[in-house]
Design a protein with these regions (language model features):
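Membrane-interfacial amphipathic/re-entrant helices at transmembrane-helix boundaries
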Residues: 1-20, 52-68
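Function-critical hydrophobic alpha-helical transmembrane segments in multi-pass membrane proteins
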Residues: 13-29, 38-39
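Helix-capping/transition residues at the boundaries of transmembrane alpha-helices
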Residues: 29-30, 106
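Alpha-helical transmembrane segments
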Residues: 39-222
Length: 222
């Protein structure tokens, strides 16, 4: 993390950006915790990926231990929240997971390439939340009002897809993206940004297709 702070960027701007990253991730995780199992499965995968990249010379270190602990904790919580929820994580739990994830990303990263790659371990959450924000801005809606426009909410509420299926899909997609980004971390910043952009475009296309189909269906019903 110290290496990130000494690479020629005005430190005040840098600290503000890092603070926004931590605050944003904490809130994004909370906003995405809306169906059974999605927050826990995402936590298992995200912290598992962080643990895999923080393993240093076959020796456990503090960030690796913390990541393993968080992943195991999510796994222990999963039976109570999946496939049918008996206990809910709540705002405190989901915000804690988002905060811890963002801190671990900065902790284990040695350069900005790694920051982008490791932050991408939470790609489905970032993509879904970002698209919902953009949609509401385009519609002129207040961002402070609760909504159900995330793709996972549309799939669950409008398409009546079982929560466990959506949560598993998000987890598997997240795992595949994470494995890809681990392989990409040494290709350079342009390649990483390009990869993330293409992934975001793909996710945006899927998001558009499902919501467009829903609009057409609602028009036919009218």
């Amino acid at each position: 993390f110290q290496d990130l702070m000494t690479k020629g960027v005005v430190w005040i701007v840098l600290y503000v950006l890092l603070a926004l990253f931590i605050i944003g991730t904490s809130n994004f995780y909370n906003f995405m915790d809306g169906i059974d199992g999605i927050a826990a499965i995402t936590g298992i995968v995200a912290f598992g990926l962080i643990a895999s990249v923080s393993w240093n010379n076959d020796q456990l270190n503090m960030p690796c231990l913390l990541a393993i602990g968080m992943s195991v904790s999510c796994f222990g919580f999963l039976p109570f929240n999946f496939p049918s929820a008996k206990v809910f994580m709540g705002d405190v739990g989901s915000i804690l997971l988002g905060f811890t994830f963002s801190v671990l990303v900065l902790w284990v990263s040695n350069n900005w390439n790694e920051v982008l790659c490791f932050a991408g371990f939470l790609f489905p959450f970032y993509a879904d939340e970002t698209l919902s924000i953009l949609e509401r801005i385009i519609r002129g809606e207040a961002l402070t009002i609760p909504h159900r426009r995330h793709l996972y909410q549309v799939l669950a509420n409008e398409y009546n897809i079982a929560h466990w299926k959506i949560s598993i899909f998000y987890g598997l997609f997240q795992l595949l993206v994470g494995i890809l980004l681990i392989q990409m971390k040494d290709v350079g910043i342009v390649g990483i940004i390009g990869t993330l952009f293409l992934l975001f475009c793909g996710f945006s296309f899927i998001n558009f297709k499902f919501k467009r189909k829903l609009q057409i269906r609602n028009l036919i019903k009218q």
